[in-house]
Amino acid sequence: MNHNMPECIARFTDILGQATMKTILGLASNGEGTADSLMEQYERGEISTDAFIDGIMQHAQRPTTREEIIAAWNAMHGGIPQERLQLIQSWKDAGHRLFLLSNNNDLHWQHILSLYDMSMFEYCFASHLLHMSKPDPRIYEAVDAQLKQKGCEGPFHFVDDILINRTTAEQLGWKTYATLDELNAVL
């Protein structure tokens, strides 16, 4: 999935102001969340969508609505290019078993489900439903255990553009790739 952080940050800066936006969403200069930020808590499913939105509304520098906050939040989702979806579908068509592990939250998850057919994946694992997020080794261990319990045998192939996420997965014996094209070359 592509992320459109500049658009999301611009919208939240308008709602919250620059300093408050960085504090509330826990954004470092690189756009990544910090461990105890409202954003990270939401991504791990530790707080509800209502609590997340209320937390933002409490610090808004101007009148705002829940709908405006949801639109700003979903602006982060930059879409999945059609060619990526076609490549993933081609793997399913070729008989490969596909699983999704995503750091996500309820608003983004519902947004994604409304836009894309996720039936290409046999199982989908989202951080907010597992109450953990990558790169915490526990999320990989939980997914690994659930897949093996369902009769899926490793080693699993894992695509993630973030090095620390791949490194943690490798420690469990997963084969990792930075891009879909890298994985496609070995399938």
Model-identified regions with their sequence ranges:
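Active-site neighborhood of HAD-like aspartate-dependent phosphohydrolases
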Residues: 1-31, 167, 171, 185
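N-terminal alpha-helical segment
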Residues: 5, 33-35, 49, 105
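Hydrophobic alpha-helical core bundles mediating ligand binding, dimerization, or RNAP-core interactions
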Residues: 8-12, 53-56, 73, 108-112
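Short, surface-exposed acidic
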Residues: 14-30, 61-72, 152-155
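A metal-dependent, Asp-based hydrolase signature
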Residues: 36-70
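Soluble or luminal CAZymes and related metallo-dependent hydrolases
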Residues: 48, 76-83, 135, 139
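Substrate-recognition element of Asp-dependent hydrolases with the DxDx(T/V) motif
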Residues: 65-113
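Asp-based, Mg2+/Mn2+-dependent phosphohydrolase catalytic module
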Residues: 92, 105-187
